[in-house]
């Protein structure tokens, strides 16, 4: 990992704390995983403060596969089955079936409709009947141990919502891409973060932060 690129956003602890404050302020953060893993950066927003403009940015600047990261207990309360029974994906990404809000959407694919779906699913007291399946939002189940159990963007998202002290631990993510459709790597992630006034941190930063807080 190129520390020179990362250090313009502070040291590891500062990057995490800036990211947590950004989430409290309703802003987005960029989180990169290890270069030997997916080697990708995800743009992350909290579900509770997500706006149509932020969703439009996710659709425009990223892969378009907007995911809603939720704790295991939330997935179970919504009775969302996993997408496949036998997950053979390389990194064990825990997709459930895709979802749509049962009310208040049209085709489900617009930024407005996807925000409606995210907020419907993430809401306190949301019920299985509030959602239709399949849809245009892709829920992801976070491991209970967060990034200390799995060094994934899903776990990083839920961990950050909790560490930020947000009422709702759910968050949305999408992988940042370049204009030509290739995946954005660390240099492009740093450029994007600077252009949009965001902080760039890593999953490893977050894991180290949690370990220092909890030990």
Curated annotation (Swiss-Prot):
The keyword Metal-binding applies. It catalyses: D-ribulose 5-phosphate = (2S)-2-hydroxy-3-oxobutyl phosphate + formate + H(+). Its cofactor is Mg(2+); Mn(2+). Gene3D superfamilies: DHBP synthase. Its EC number is 4.1.99.12. Mg(2+) 2 binds at residues 38, 153. Pathway: Cofactor biosynthesis; riboflavin biosynthesis; 2-hydroxy-3-oxobutyl phosphate from D-ribulose 5-phosphate: step 1/1. D-ribulose 5-phosphate binds at residues 37-38, 42, 150-154, 175. It holds the Pfam family DHBP_synthase. Mg(2+) 1 binds at residue 38. One of its GO terms (molecular function) is manganese ion binding. Keywords: Lyase, Magnesium, Manganese, Metal-binding, Riboflavin biosynthesis. The record marks 136, 175 as: Essential for catalytic activity. Binds 2 divalent metal cations per subunit. Magnesium or manganese. One of its GO terms (cellular component) is cytosol. PANTHER family: 3,4-DIHYDROXY-2-BUTANONE 4-PHOSPHATE SYNTHASE (PTHR21327:SF38), GTP CYCLOHYDROLASE II-RELATED (PTHR21327). Homodimer. Catalyzes the conversion of D-ribulose 5-phosphate to formate and 3,4-dihydroxy-2-butanone 4-phosphate. Belongs to the DHBP synthase family. This is 3,4-dihydroxy-2-butanone 4-phosphate synthase. It comes from Desulfatibacillum aliphaticivorans. The gene is ribB.
């Amino acid at each position: 990992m190129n520390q020179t690129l990362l250090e313009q956003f502070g040291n590891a602890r500062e990057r995490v704390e800036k990211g947590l404050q950004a989430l409290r302020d309703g802003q987005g953060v960029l989180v990169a995983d290890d270069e030997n893993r997916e080697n990708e950066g995800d743009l992350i927003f909290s579900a509770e403060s997500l706006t149509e403009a932020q969703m439009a940015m996710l659709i425009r600047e990223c892969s378009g596969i907007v995911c809603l990261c939720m704790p295991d207990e939330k997935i179970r309360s919504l009775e969302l089955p996993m997408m496949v029974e036998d997950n053979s994906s390389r990194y064990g990404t825990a997709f459930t079936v895709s979802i749509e809000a049962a009310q208040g959407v049209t085709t489900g694919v617009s930024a407005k409709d996807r925000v409606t779906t995210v907020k419907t699913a993430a809401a306190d007291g949301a019920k299985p009947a509030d959602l239709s399946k399949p849809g245009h939002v892709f829920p992801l189940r976070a491991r209970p141990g967060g990034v200390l159990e799995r060094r994934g963007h899903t776990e990083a998202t839920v961990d950050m919502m909790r560490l930020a002290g947000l009422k709702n631990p759910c968050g949305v993510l999408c992988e940042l891409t370049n204009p030509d459709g290739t995946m954005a790597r660390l240099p492009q992630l740093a450029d994007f973060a600077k252009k949009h006034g965001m902080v760039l941190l890593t999953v490893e930063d977050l894991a180290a932060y949690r370990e220092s807080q909890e030990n």
